[in-house]
Amino acid sequence: MIALFLLPVFITIHTIIAIWLFKWLRHIHVVFRKRLVIGIIIAIYTYFILDMYIAALIPHGKLERMMKLIGNYWLGFTIYAAMVVGIALLIRLILVKSRFKDSRFVKSKKVFILNGLLCIVIIGALCIGGHINATRLITTDYEVNIDKSGGEFADLDVVLVADLHMGYNIGVDMINQMVDRINDCDPDVVLIGGDIFDNSYESMDDPEGIMEAFKNIKSRYGVYAVWGNHDIAETIIGGFTFPSKNKKMSDIRMDQFLEEAGIKLLRDESVIIEDSVYIFGRPDEERPGRGIDIRLTPAELVSTMDTQKPVIVLEHEPKELKELAKAGVDLHLSGHTHAGQTFPMNLTAKFSFENPYGLKMVDEMPSIVTSGVGLYGPYIRVGTKPEISNVHVHFR
């Protein structure tokens, strides 16, 4: 639904930015006052605004992929251009309305040009720096205690990854980097908390190469996954979706990909490791997937297991945490939030989720939310880091 409202907002923002830009360019050089030059700039600027929408309408292929990548980066530019130019215009307005309104400083052409250059440098630094930051994966360690016997295990080393968003932004290089970090942790088990794909199987540039990377994961007791809200086949624009009356499900090739890569998909079901520790995989609440209309409640899912043994729940989004804790779940692992992904959303994420990021105790149950390996929309992270989470679980 958000995608339907994105275009008018996009156009309004860029109209304001364009007015500011042309005013600034006219101060730079007289060539930017010529109609032909202005027309060329307007045409290029208009293309970038419409790029994401055009890409959503054309068939899958190299052209569509290139346009989607351009659109994603342009969306990131839009976010920071709107912020920086908006702040610059607000400061100028305050000065104009203040006692400095007649000051040469406020009216100076040189100051206006320097102000514009500063805005461009800041926007560029945020976009370029944010992109570089988004490509550098880190490992975050957690220590968790569960007051139950672990049976065969005194400790269990769990690596949690989520939000890979394999597709337009994330490809073989990032997945190889992820696999290397996973193997460095020497895990007992690897859990993938959904949003493995980015709404389209075709968006991956090298599915076979990515699959081979997954096969290199070294885990003593296997790799398990759940689906997230992006693990379905649907049209997206800048990470936002269109409404549909039809039930949205994963592309069958996504299911086959996991199977061939050696990843076990958990669909409202559990596995037990060495008859000692349960791992239960919950479907996504809004998009539970093929063959599931309504997922099990916390009480229902716990009733399928022996709660004398440790129960770890893996799901995409950190929801119903209090209910899960009350039902007897010992550890909850999830993703989805991206820790806000980029400034300023990283500051507001805490108002949107029960646990926006990291380790949070919900009654006696630890909840761990990872910021994710990949991202949706613009390939930019400012104020957050892409990560894998290395969770050291200690039993009684």
Predicted region positions:
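Soluble catalytic domains of enzymes that build or remodel membrane lipids, polysaccharides, and related
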Residues: K148-R396
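Glycine-centered secondary-structure boundary/capping sites
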Residues: H29, R99-F100, I138, G262, ...
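Short amphipathic alpha-helical coupling elements at transmembrane boundaries
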Residues: R65-L69, V144, V159, D180
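Non-catalytic terminal accessory segments
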Residues: M1-T135
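Hydrophobic alpha-helical transmembrane segments in integral membrane proteins
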Residues: I113, I123-G150, Y168-D173
